[in-house]
Curated annotation (Swiss-Prot):
Function (record text): Part of the AP-3 complex, an adaptor-related complex which seems to be clathrin-associated. The complex is associated with the Golgi region as well as more peripheral structures. It facilitates the budding of vesicles from the Golgi membrane and may be directly involved in trafficking to the vacuole. It also functions in maintaining the identity of lytic vacuoles and in regulating the transition between storage and lytic vacuoles.
Encoding gene, per UniProt annotation: AP3M
Protein name from the UniProt record: AP-3 complex subunit mu
Lineage of producing organism: Eukaryota, Viridiplantae, Streptophyta, Embryophyta, Tracheophyta
Organism: Arabidopsis thaliana (Mouse-ear cress)
Compartment annotation: Cytoplasm; Golgi apparatus; Cytoplasmic vesicle membrane
GO cellular component terms, semicolon-separated: clathrin adaptor complex; cytoplasmic vesicle membrane; Golgi apparatus
Length: 415
């Protein structure tokens, strides 16, 4: 049972406090939490569950905002974390994003949503389709009316029609003049390359994202050409488990609008589309650096938005870096970013220059880790392919669209 939820900005300010039970949680717990973060750094915010002297704390971080929940009794931690993730997703969908200004400008709506989503410390209504029938999303007209009439509440006077439905994630009878459904494969490649250039780890985290604009209650079936490569699948509640377990086919009645149908991982990949070859030599207080970036295996689509960033060691007093392609920027916190864009066909992009060490140091003993970024549109590097999307009750003039994209996730090259 959760007793309180706090929303904390990236500067430590408590933007919102929602007491959930009769036992009030003092705000001093947030001061303790922030003091621990200041003393321990980012590693503290990576902990999903924290035992404070007085409470169990559960936290997630989204776009610089910390969602912090408190409880004095033992409870399943995954339930608390999953609920906080659902709160963040709902707020992002309602407000069109997550940042400090949006939450402060829509303070009343955030409170109303939390009132409906949790009751006496237990999750209650978390489906966006039902919440939107209870509480209207903010818009310019509603804000102007609230100023004129003095009524700031967005709560509806009618019971949501989906509350009694067998599929609570979908409105009772949505209607569209044109019936459309879009399927996106969105993948991230996580990789680690050691100092010898060997691929230590390479795997894909992917999501099947959909946008359904279909009339009535469509029953969809989505099948893959090679589902055996998938691991660690997580499904939206609309997915029926039995067809997947028996035939590895996704059978579901979709929510209305955009949603994530499933997530998955594809592990132990043998190759990456881009290579990074860094080299650093140091002598007499000066280091020479050279980094080559090129295409290792052509995916068949253009590799775009290539970037390479690394943190200069603290012992480096100054840096003089340049490249034969793209731009190089060095920030005041010693973060160097090389923006390459696309790799040209006539030359290999190269970053080179010198690093000056602090007085008294002859050689560099701490080497940076290079982080690669890229994006490839039109292909899923995992090799996952959608075979077909069938509708059991086909509406007239149905349009189906499929897309895929892969981008770099945690892609580290160590030296």
């Amino acid at each position: 049972m959760l007793q309180c939820i706090f929303l904390i900005s990236d500067s430590g300010e408590v933007m919102l406090e929602k007491q959930l039970t009769g036992h009030r949680v003092d705000r001093s717990i947030c001061a303790w939490f922030w003091d621990q973060y200041i003393s321990q750094g980012d590693s503290f915010k990576a902990l999903p569950v924290i035992a404070s002297p007085t409470h169990y704390l559960f936290q997630i971080v989204r776009d610089g905002i910390t969602f912090l929940a408190c409880s004095q009794v033992e409870m399943p931690p995954l339930m608390a974390i999953e609920f906080l993730c659902r709160v963040a997703d709902v707020l992002s969908e309602y407000l069109g994003g997550l940042n400090e200004d949006l939450i402060k400008d829509n303070f009343i709506i955030v409170y109303e949503l939390l009132d409906e989503m949790i009751d006496n410390g237990f999750p209650l209504t978390t489906e966006p389709s039902i919440l939107k029938e209870m509480i209207a999303p903010p818009n310019l007209v509603s804000k102007m009316l609230s100023v004129v009439t003095g009524n700031a509440s967005n709560v509806s006077d009618t019971l949501p029609s989906g509350a009694g439905s067998c599929v609570p994630w979908r409105p009772t009878d949505p209607k569209y003049s044109s019936n459309e459904v879009y399927v996106d494969l969105v993948e991230e490649m996580d990789a680690i390359v050691n100092r010898d250039g060997e691929l230590v780890k390479c795997e894909i985290y992917g999501e099947v994202q959909m946008n359904s604009q279909l009339t009535g209650f469509p029953d969809l079936t989505l099948s893959f050409a090679n589902p055996s490569i998938l691991e660690d699948m997580r499904f939206h509640p609309c997915v029926r488990y039995r067809p997947w377990e028996s035939h590895q086919v996704l059978s579901f009645v979709p929510p209305d609008g955009e949603f994530k149908l499933m997530s998955y991982r594809v592990k132990k990949l043998k190759n990456t589309p881009v290579y990074v070859k860094p080299q650093i030599t140091s002598d007499s207080g000066t280091c020479r650096i050279s980094v080559l970036v090129g295409i290792r295996s052509d995916p068949g689509k253009t590799i775009e938005s290539i970037t390479l960033s690394f943190q200069l060691p603290h012992c480096v007093s100054s840096a003089d870096l340049s490249s034969n392609h793209g731009t190089v920027t060095i920030l005041s916190n010693k973060t160097c970013t090389w923006t390459i864009g696309r790799i040209p066909k006539d030359k290999t992009p190269c970053l080179s220059g010198t690093l000056a060490l602090e007085p008294g140091l002859e050689r560099l003993h701490v080497f940076p880790t290079f982080k690669l970024g890229f994006k490839i549109m039109g292909i899923a590097l995992s090799g996952l392919r959608i075979e077909k999307l069938d509708l059991q009750t086909i509406p007239p003039r149905l349009y189906k669209g499929f897309r895929a994209q892969t981008r770099a996730g945690e892609f580290d090259v160590r030296l």
